[in-house]
Swiss-Prot record:
HAMAP family: HSP90
Molecular-function annotations in GO: ATP binding; ATP hydrolysis activity; ATP-dependent protein folding chaperone; unfolded protein binding
Taxonomic lineage: Bacteria, Pseudomonadati, Pseudomonadota, Alphaproteobacteria, Hyphomicrobiales
Record's subunit section: Homodimer.
Matching NCBIfam families: PRK05218.1
The keyword ATP-binding belongs to this UniProt entry's keyword annotation: yes
Keywords: ATP-binding, Chaperone, Cytoplasm, Nucleotide-binding, Stress response
Gene symbol of the encoding locus: htpG
Domain of life from the UniProt record: Bacteria
Name of the protein in its database record: Chaperone protein HtpG
A cellular-component GO term for this protein: cytoplasm
Organism: Methylorubrum populi (strain ATCC BAA-705 / NCIMB 13946 / BJ001)
Record carries keyword Chaperone: yes
UniProt region (A), positions on chain: 1-331
């Protein structure tokens, strides 16, 4: 090997990724061309944009993506005149990938089935940003020769996809990239111009950068129309064309749940073509905070980092195109341009209005609920992050409920409130089933009071930020037990409760400082104990999240509430009256309340022993002799 050739091992995760891509997506191999062509077009767009502020980077007049099959050499070359890559870029972009990305990709492969059983694995490639590696589905060796625009050196990256790659100096007259695929024996179809033309027209027809295919005689034929679909009148666009464009910008295989195509005219003029997906992406949308809307100026791609929509609408894909911005504005200046800020507000309002109209369509309530199941957790972030839009977002939210079988909304909840009910009650936990069985609900159910059941991670944060809805305060049931005294239980009156002063005093003494208070409650029916948040500070679920994040919680300890009508509490009260030491039993009660609330016992071993002793009857004996 030449001394100038550097050999590098792939990051450990790249080898695993290559194996996943090659074997899991083998039957959909044609998507490799979609990914490589899309990357080449993006590189061309990025060079065009950078040239606006640096004339030395100007694109050549014949800039295009060129696809050139060579039957004699059994190679397929994809070339562009784009921004190119330096030696460091090649190593970083093609030699490493985040460990978390590979793990998420692997998990998603196993779950890639649509609602009707269709195979959705091909859509994973683009969503996880691993499109380049799809080349190894058809090639047993890949070489990439690239020269960075503005740079003097070219470098070649080469690999057989089996654990390592090489880097060596190369020669390229102009900036750009050549990707050469040395095709496998079973990939002959990608040496045929007609097959390549079919794939490009299927997957890349709307890419604005010209794409050409060179045949065996050296003749080049245009392979894409490159039309700016969003600039055409809606009446001239078919549903199938909308779907194809959506799949191009989203890298998905589903159909759009909503298509928004409009032109704003007047003081501010722009065109928007946006899509709301009908399926949740495989990469958790909560984690993927990248913008999905591209900014174009006079049809020219400028950036996908303009944040044309707020983070809480990041599930929306599409394009916004305007003539009201200069072509040569830098990305840094772009963020503070008043025109762009106005476009952001207008585009956000348009999306909210669309969601609002659909949420009010009672004939298609199931359709909106499906959307909310996919993206509701992200939409809720808007309550927390966007003060100006909270009032608009709140009616769009949907919730499970302690009394309703399906989903409900805040307006519907308010319409069902009891006359004497002062607040909108909610309970937060990690999953809906735990919520439905929570002891926290017993007193509210006994009084026929509806409680909203919240199980998304963000649900611990946004209710406090919203504060009120239609002048009704939002209140966690872990903080709202005192309100129950104002509401009468339904059905027969409960039996009188015994006085528990001695037991309460004993429990307080035994449990300090783990609880801030012990008190008798009327909100329990079947359970012996429950935890409540103190009057000051966040509710219990927020406290748990803070502890899990290692941030601690400096507020008051929780309150332990006991049910005076429960047999266990009555038995312990008798023992307290008799002067017994109840320190061990007090600890078990607190741990029992913690477990009921989805938390862990303070001392799991001691708790397990106490439960085992109870099952053996050792706890019950004093009660039997009383």
């Amino acid at each position: 090997m030449s001394e100038t050739v550097e050999r590098h091992e792939f990051g450990a995760e790249v080898g695993r990724l290559l194996d996943l891509v090659v074997h899991a997506l083998y039957s959909d191999r044609e998507i490799f061309l979609r990914e490589l062509v899309a990357n080449a077009a993006d590189a061309t767009d990025r060079r065009r944009f950078e040239a606006l502020t640096n004339e030395a980077l100007a694109l050549p007049s014949d800039a295009r993506v060129l696809i050139a099959p060579d039957k004699a050499a059994r190679t397929l070359t994809i070339s562009d005149s784009g921004i190119g890559m330096s030696k460091e870029d090649l190593a970083q972009n093609l030699g490493t990938i985040a460990r978390s990305g590979t793990r998420a990709f692997s998990q998603a492969l196993g779950e890639a089935k649509g609602s009707e059983g269709e195979d959705l694995r091909p859509s994973l490639i683009g969503q996880f940003g691993v499109g380049f590696y799809s080349a190894f589905m058809v090639a047993d060796r890949v070489t990439v020769t690239s020269r960075r625009a503005g740079g003097e050196e070219a470098w070649t990256w080469a690999s057989d996809g089996k654990g390592s790659y090489t880097l060596e100096p190369a020669s390229r007259e102009q900036a750009g990239t050549d990707i050469v695929l040395h095709l496998k024996e079973d990939a002959d179809e990608y040496l045929e111009s007609y097959r390549l033309d079919h794939v490009v027209r299927k997957w890349a027809d709307n890419i604005a950068v010209p794409i050409a295919i060179r045949d065996a005689e050296g003749k080049e034929e245009a392979a894409n129309r490159g039309t700016a679909l969003w600039r055409k009148p809606k009446s001239e666009i078919t549903e199938e064309q909308y779907k194809e464009f959506y799949r191009t910008v989203s890298h998905g295989f589903d159909e759009p749940w909503a298509t928004l195509h409009w032109r704003a005219e007047g003081a501010l003029e722009f065109t928007g073509l946006l899509f709301v997906p009908s399926m949740k992406p495989f990469m958790p949308v909560e984690d993927d905070r990248r913008s999905k809307v591209r900014l174009h100026v006079r049809r020219m791609f400028i950036t996908d980092e303009a944040e044309l929509l707020p983070n809480w609408l990041r599930f929306v894909h599409g394009v916004v195109d305007t003539d009201d911005l200069p072509l040569n504005v830098s990305r840094e200046m772009l963020q503070s341009t008043p025109t762009l800020q106005k476009i952001r507000r207008a585009v956000t309002t348009r999306v909210i209005n669309e969601l609002s109209n659909r949420s009010k369509n009672t004939e298609k309530a199931d359709d909106y609920q499906k959307f909310f199941e996919n993206f509701g957790s992200v939409l809720k972030e808007g309550i927390y992050e966007d003060f100006e839009r909270r009032a608009e977002i709140a009616p769009l939210l949907r919730f499970r409920s302690s009394t309703e079988g399906g989903w409900t909304s805040l307006p519907d909840y308010v319409s069902r409130m009891k006359p004497e009910q002062e607040a909108i009650y909610y309970l937060v936990a990690d999953d809906v089933e735990a919520l439905k069985n929570s002891a926290q609900l017993e007193g509210f159910r006994a009084r026929g009071v509806e409680v909203l059941l919240l199980s998304d991670h963000v649900d611990a944060f946004w209710p406090e930020q919203l504060g009120k809805f239609e002048d009704k305060p939002l209140r966690s049931v872990t903080q709202g037990s005192a309100d129950l005294a104002k509401l009468k239980p339904e059905g027969e009156a409960a039996e009188d409760a015994p006085a528990l002063d001695r037991l309460v005093a004993a429990l307080k003494l035994a449990l300090e400082p783990d609880v801030s208070d012990v008190r008798v409650t009327d909100r329990l029916v079947d359970s012996a104990v429950v935890l409540a948040a103190s009057g000051m500070g966040p509710d219990l679920q927020m406290q748990r999240l803070l502890r899990r994040a290692g941030r601690g919680f400096g507020g008051s300890a929780p309150i332990l509430e006991i049910n005076p009508r429960h047999a266990l509490i009555r038995s312990l009260n008798d023992r307290a009256e008799a002067g017994e030491d109840l320190k061990a039993e007090a600890g078990t009660l607190l741990d029992l309340a913690r477990v009921q609330d989805g938390d862990t016992p303070r001392d799991p071993v001691a708790f397990a022993r106490a439960v085992a002793a109870a099952l053996a009857g050792t706890v019950a004996k004093p009660a039997e002799s009383a």
